[in-house]
Amino acid sequence: MSSPLNNRGTCSRSSSARSRHSARVVAQTPVDAQLHAEFESSQRNFDYSSSVSAAIRPSVSTSTVSTYHQTMQRGLYIQPFGCLLAVHPDTFTLLAYSENAPEMLDLTPHAVPTIDQRDALAVGADVRTLFRSQSSVALHKAATFGEVNLLNPILVHARTSGKPFYAILHRIDVGLVIDLEPVNPVDVPVTAAGALKSYKLAAKAISRLQSLPSGNLSLLCDVLVREVSELTGYDRVMAYKFHEDEHGEVISECRRSDLEPYLGLHYPATDIPQASRFLFMKNKVRMICDCSATLVKIIQDDSLAQPLSLCGSTLRASHGCHAQYMANMGSVASLVMSVTISNDEEEDVDTGSDQQPKGRKLWGLVVCHHTSPRFVPFPLRYACEFLLQVFGIQLNKEVELAAQAKERHILRTQTLLWDMLLRDAPVGIFTQSPNVMDLVKCDGVALYYQNQLLLLGSTPSESEIKSIATWLQENHDGSTGLSTDSLVEAGYPGAAALREVVCGMAAIKISSKDFIFWFRSHTTKEIKWGGAKHEPVDADDNGRKMHPRSSFKAFLEVVKWRSVPWEDVEMDAIHSLQLILRGSLQDEDANRNNVRSIVKAPPDDTKKIQGLLELRTVTNEMVRLIETATAPVLAVDIAGNINGWNNKAAELTGLPVMEAIGRPLIDLVVVDSIEVVKRILDSALQGIEEQNLEIKLKAFHEQECNGPIILMVNSCCSRDLSEKVIGVCFVGQDLTTQKMIMDKYTRIQGDYVAIVKNPSELIPPIFMINDLGSCLEWNKAMQKITGIQREDVIDKLLIGEVFTLHDYGCRVKDHATLTKLSILMNAVISGQDPEKLLFGFFDTDGKYIESLLTVNKRINAEGKITGAICFLHVASPELQHALQVQKMSEQAATNSFKELTYIHQELRNPLNGMQFTCNLLEPSELTEEQRKLLSSNILCQDQLKKILHDTDLESIEQCYMEMNTVEFNLEEALNTVLMQGIPLGKEKRISIERDWPVEISRMYLYGDNLRLQQVLADYLACALQFTQPAEGPIVLQVIPKKENIGSGMQIAHLEFRIVHPAPGVPEALIQEMFRHNPEVSREGLGLYICQKLVKTMSGTVQYLREADTSSFIILIEFPVAQLSSKRSKPSTSKF
């Protein structure tokens, strides 16, 4: 993949990454569909090696892709280890069921069944009658629960036999799916309220993961696969990582000793299709018990418009090609778990709040294989999923640390290169150390400057580099450079001759004729897999058979013309160097003598004075903030003597500031805190900062009678201008009152009633849970801080019903918070030492509460752990008030959403009436012009109906939503867009003109015409809004370009321009179009959603400002439909 280095203000690192990812997904999906179709048609004769050539084959029909998606997401079969019921969520009437359900639920006895038994499992029957009363109540209650998956599994019993099942529920578009898995009689059943118990299965594994040192991703993955292997007992457990180009790699493995190793194996992107990756995001754990088992068909209500969606079903059947792949590698059963991390590329702008939920992206998979059939009960699978969530949190930290380390390295190298450039540009960055090769990972670099070459490392020859420079000037003269991981795909004619030396290249212009090149060799040089060394002859039919060894061959074939991709952070570094060079050298065209010119840096003295003035301002402001802070803050020098002591510290200890300054800190702490303080000081001198450490300060004067002051502190190193550590600052949180209550609780050995019922204002917020995770107590302080009354939480699940991800209960900001809370509760209930957690949630008024949560185990008279007692230490009222102000806008957004929901519902009926009226008019005898107007009217209604169904904005934002593919006439769609803009244009007395060639009227395409209409109409309305009558017309311009792909297939590359008079749309609104934030305006949200829809259609949006005009530029491509004699003549209506 190649990309020009253009300087565009709207481009960012994250948008670049998203564009590349979207392009790969779009490119891979038709290939996946084609391979699937070929497998289905050939079955056992399928040639796996064709996956290599599939990527360069001609196009795939949209019907093939649609059929493929339907098969992947809406298959008609399940695995036989359980049965499936689909019901209406309100009435529990049956919508669909699997053919094995009657047998599993004991509705088909050997005797002649009764009428009730025959009718109990029929479409339209009430499913609750199939289970005993207590089970029916549990299912009914679960159906009313927002996040129903948090209640899984629900233990139910069949009415006739009492046979126990785990009911695993999830919602789909038409109702509620209930997967029923029989409970093994020898297992102790886990009830819904006891879902917390399944976490205990993974408690030790979680502890081991959390105890690992940071900075070692390989060790983290090795421990994970080992723990999963011990938990599940599979013969082989592997950790897969997806690389940026979508191919996968086995980065860790735990296997049975006699099995072939797969560690280091790379496989092409087509091995795990994009549709499967989408399913892994929907269903985090996927089990196949026996890939050779006979599948079970689903019977569904004939009135359902399409087959049942099985994306979230635990029973979804395996696809034929996957089952054959497993069989070929000697695997009968498998368990696959997705590894997701925070998608920081979703938002590249700091919104000023960390409380907005971030999206997730698929980082990789943990894959388990077994050589015989294997069933893992749901509670154990749930424990594995929980373990993977913990791993995801740890992994997120590792990914962030690695990215930060890489950026720090680049910044250090850039600083040194800049210093060299001041003395000798640009030759110095090649002849001195470090040099330009140290900036980014590469195999060689070249400087082409004033018709001379300077080479480092492995590079093409001088003549070849000059040829590349000439090619860049002739073919990419409008850009400032080029980056590509494949010179072949970039179109360089001499790429084949360079393959053994160079495949990838990043090139920048430093003047009109001078370049710097970075080169990378092909990926295969960096690939090491032990399995490649001892390949048996014809073990896999020379790569034709689906097998990991064939996957490796296919991967090597795919990447033989490709290098490791250039990362965004690397391209940022290269681009920054380019800007420095272009600023320090005069362009050759402007300097006929070809003399280098170095821009003089400001005098050192001036810079130092300027820096000191800025530092003084910042220092004064920091001192003021520390002195007035509502938290205790103290500081010491390198000798450990106090040199900072704010008003809050003086208030708590009774020791005035002037008495504290200059005294050793160890003289002010109690005896059992001296070692802790010494350790903190020693670590700080080495540059290591500590968090959440407890120290006890002595009390003085009037506070002496209150005993020691207990602080939870974070340490941070104070440094001078040369980065030398000169002291330590402690920021603390007063836990004295809370600690006193907990000590009292410990002394009275669990007599919590005296504490929880105590009305004293000094009693902190307290709640309690039993060993099943249900809430037992919720004291007055907890009611006050959350706004939730005691009776509303008693007997409810703490995680899922009290603390939730939704608008009921106490909402937390993200799934990671619930995961951390679950870890803490599980650890304490399992008997581990008490822990603390920084914990935040929203109260019933939408105010965000930040607190420190401390959890202690509850023990009964026999010494058995019966649950946990939890104390919240909440931030000061001043901080709460500030957070409340910050969240007022969020509350307003919630109210707006409710109003929008009402309007959304009320619009449906009149819209249905309008559509009915139009349908009555269609058979009427109308003129050609009237028929065109009617057609545009119907398209407008279809577009409105489509928008009204857009309730899942998250799927739109993540570009995961499903697009329709229909044949449509482009001019009809464009005329419909113009019709939507004309009323506002007439109102503002602004004319709307169209500018497109006559061929548009005859152009029929495949794609989602309604989404295209929505996008263009919104951008047109925005242009109208910011245009004044006297400024000129608005023009909808279309520039088509057809490209032949293979024989008989064409792609239409379309450039839509909505040209309007300058100054155009305000810059702030354009920024909102590309960067969504909580304070987004109504117009900005509409533009943002349209931009996401365009990305989902594999297109891009730009906004161009010129001297007299501004333009929305939308670039999209659609397959051209084949000619059909049934089509109506092209539209020629004018506006």
Curated annotation (Swiss-Prot):
Signal peptide: none annotated. It comes from the Eukaryota. Residues 1-26 are annotated as: Disordered. GO terms for biological process: detection of visible light; red, far-red light phototransduction; regulation of DNA-templated transcription. SMART domains: GAF, HATPase_c, HisKA, PAS. Residues 618-688, 748-822 form the PAS domain. Homodimer. This is Phytochrome C.
